[in-house]
Structure formats: C-alpha cells, structure tokens
Amino acid sequence: MIPTTLTSAGRTSSRVTSSSVSFVSRGFRGRRRDTEGDLTRVPPGQHVTEDFPVLSAGPTPHTPLDEWTFSIVNGDERETWTWDEFRALPSETVTVDIHCVTRWSKLDTTWEGVSIDTLLEQVEHEAAYVLAFCDGGYTTNLPLEDVSDGKAWVAFAYDGEPLDPEHGGPARLLVPHLYFWKSAKWVRGLMLRDTDEPGFWETYGYHSYGDPWREQRYAGD
C-alpha cells in the first residue's frame, strides 16, 4: 500500500490538428520555466501557473450523483459501482505536479481519490491497456502499467473540496506523470484491452503515450 500522502514530479506530453474541434479555455496566468527555482519539476517547454486553467472540447456535463456509475469493462464482463459504493471504497490523498499539453504546469496540487489498483482488484484480467471512457463520448488510451502500482486514481476532490464539473467532477482520472489530457475529465469507466486503441485526442494527432519530459505532444514526437 502506498502512503496516504504522496508527492510526485510527474512526467508526460501530446497534440491536436483538426479545425473542427472547439476549445474552451480560461484562467491562465503563467510564469516562464526559466524563472522557477526548481527546474527539475518543470518539463521542457512548460510555464508554471498559479491558476487552474479550464480546457474542454465541448460542453461541461453535469451528471447527478444518483445517476453516476463507474465501471471496469473486461470483454463481456462489467464490474460497476454506484456513487455511494464508489465513495465507500478506500481513498488516498495525493499531492502531485500536473502538466498540460498546452504548456502550463501547476505544482503541488492536492487530490483525493480511489486508486485504480483498488478498482482492478475486483476484476480478473490479463489486459495490457485500458481505454478510459467518459461523459460526452471522450476516450483516452493508456498502458495498464501506467494506471497501476500506485500511479493513477479516480479523483473526486481537489484541494479539499468536491471536484467542480469544469475540472472533471464529479470524478476524473488522475495520471499525473503523463500530460494532463490523459487524466480524463468526467470519467465513467475503464475498458480493459489486449491491444492499444487510440482515444479521442489521439485520433486527432496527439501522441499515443504523452510523456511531458520527452515532449511527446504529437504523434511522432
């Protein structure tokens, strides 16, 4: 079991090319990377912000908690939790740095959530990848090893408060070592897969993995 409070510098990256995709972005006030005292925490090409910018490709979903569920889908099998069942699971508080592909980084962010390890304990599988699926039809792909062994959570609180819908509430994926688009907002489950399948942004040219320290913003980076 990992400690209840963690600190991570995180690592990741990504890209998009279609003019048909619209963005909603606000709240950015940044400082250049070269003004930071501890450069080891800020990946190349990133600026530190004290705000929490909002970036979405569509409308913000507002799912009532009594209608919310989270599922692990493994072929024809599905393990599902209601909101109350999910909140009854053991949770962890983690403090991590996050890095957006749009070049902002926010340091020392504090979240509370359920470890993906806790959820996967309920399912027998031999999967190598997961595809996160969310309200609004958004998906993103990740290697299983990047969401297990204490690397990822389904987060329901930020800075001690319930997670706002604009930041992915009631629950979002938190995978801080990868670019933040991999921490999918409004997450509703994980599909376990033997092969890697591109998600939403990945089909528009973003990198399949997204390591910010290697600046993997776009396919081919």
What label would you give each PLM region?
Residues 2-8:
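Alpha-helix boundary/capping motif
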Residues 22-221:
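Structured, non-membrane catalytic/scaffold regions adjacent to prosthetic-group chemistry
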